[in-house]
A protein has these predicted regions:
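Nucleic-acid substrate recognition interfaces
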Residues: 1-184
Length: 184
């Protein structure tokens, strides 16, 4: 069994990176809302759910159209993660209706954030900088040392209403778990 550890750090993007973050936040929100609308219509018509794999395939085709070509300019994994989050929200609603029906994300109400997964070293931390896909090297205020045996799993970038940017980095911690999955 693997334990996860998360660390939250402040990041200081330059003006160009702030624009890229804003585009990514907007595209993630647009993809989430587009597919939420599609899932609602499908469910109302024939009481079925559009599963993640179908959404991901259709989104890949959608990115090739001229109308949605702007989606190519942001991290594709972040877009896929928004579909996964939507799929999880739908599954949770059907398993436990008390969780509530998934809501549309708005510019005013929603928290600006996106998640991306580390694949083949596309996300790294070195010398006070965090390398993110399609964004590049972002200055990171690293106030904690991350143990060498940890393996980077995913990153969530968020922006507060005051305009500050933070990153929450999730790590696998293989050495923390002992025999039978119990902490040593």
């Amino acid at each position: 069994m693997v334990a996860n550890s998360a660390y939250k750090f402040r990041i200081y993007p330059n003006d160009e990176q702030k624009i890229l973050f804003a585009k990514t936040f907007g595209c993630v929100r647009m993809v989430y809302n587009h597919w939420l609308d599609r899932k609602i219509r499908q469910y109302e018509e024939n009481k079925t759910n559009v599963i993640y794999t179908i959404c991901a395939k259709e989104m890949a085709a959608m990115k090739k159209t001229e109308e949605y070509g702007f989606l190519k300019k942001v991290d594709s994994i972040a877009l896929q993660q928004s579909l996964r989050h939507l799929d999880t929200a739908f599954q949770n609603f059907f398993k436990q209706p008390k969780t509530g029906f998934p809501r549309f994300k708005s510019k005013k109400r929603s928290k600006n954030s996106y998640s991306t997964v580390c694949i083949n070293g596309n996300i790294t931390i070195s010398n006070g900088y965090l390398k993110l896909p399609k964004i590049g090297q972002v200055h990171l205020k690293q106030h904690r040392i991350i143990p060498e045996e940890y393996s980077l799993k995913s990153v969530t970038v968020s922006q507060t209403p005051s305009g500050k940017y933070y990153v929450c980095i999730l790590y696998y911690d293989y050495h923390r778990m002992g025999i039978g999955g119990y902490l040593l």
